[in-house]
Amino acid sequence: MESKRKVVLVGAGFVGMSMAYSLLNQGGVEELVLIDVNKDKTIGEEMDLSDGLPYAPHKMKIKAGDYSECKDANIVVITAGLAQKPGQTRLELAVVNAKIMKEITQNVMANGFSGVFIIASNPVDLMSYVVAEVSGMPKSKVIGSGTVLDTARLRYLIAEYLQVSSKNVHAYMLGEHG
């Protein structure tokens, strides 16, 4: 694996593009590759994000790509999956999204990926398990976003109640996300 900091982001929806925007602004990535089943959307997102490159803290390359880009990636972030529909249980969503995770993971691994997976697709705990099982990677190389969002919400609510900055609230949510 090369020493450059390369992230492949699979899923160009709201969560994926929020992640991409954060990576652009934080400057920790040298190359960001976007993959999505909707190729036209991915190209459009690449163009939009690239417009912000002059304001990025470091030199960075953004491109729409395919799974062959995973070979030399340090991290593959998976945000792809269907959203939960009204009346649909998380277990029903898990069945649908597990199929998507399996296909994505097989495509990533078929291209020689040996880095770290970060999973942000719901239900995240189950999707992380699917990726770990399908990839055959050590479980230490498959990280689910877990309760990070729940923790942020908890800290925000406590801060609002106490009328302080959420930066000054140190609390953590434990358990399953959702």
Predicted region positions:
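Rossmann-like NAD(P)(H) cofactor-binding subdomain of soluble oxidoreductases
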Residues: 89-155
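Glycine-rich Rossmann-fold phosphate-binding loop(s) that bind the pyrophosphate
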Residues: 12-13
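Aromatic pocket-lining residues of Rossmann-like dinucleotide-binding sites
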Residues: 23
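NAD(P)H-binding glycine-rich loop region in Rossmannoid oxidoreductase-like domains
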Residues: 58-69, 74-94
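N-terminal Rossmann-fold NAD(P) dinucleotide-binding loop
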Residues: 16-17
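Mobile gating loops/cap/lid regions near enzyme active sites that modulate substrate access
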Residues: 156-178
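Conserved N-terminal Rossmann-fold NAD(P) cofactor-binding segment
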Residues: 31, 37-72
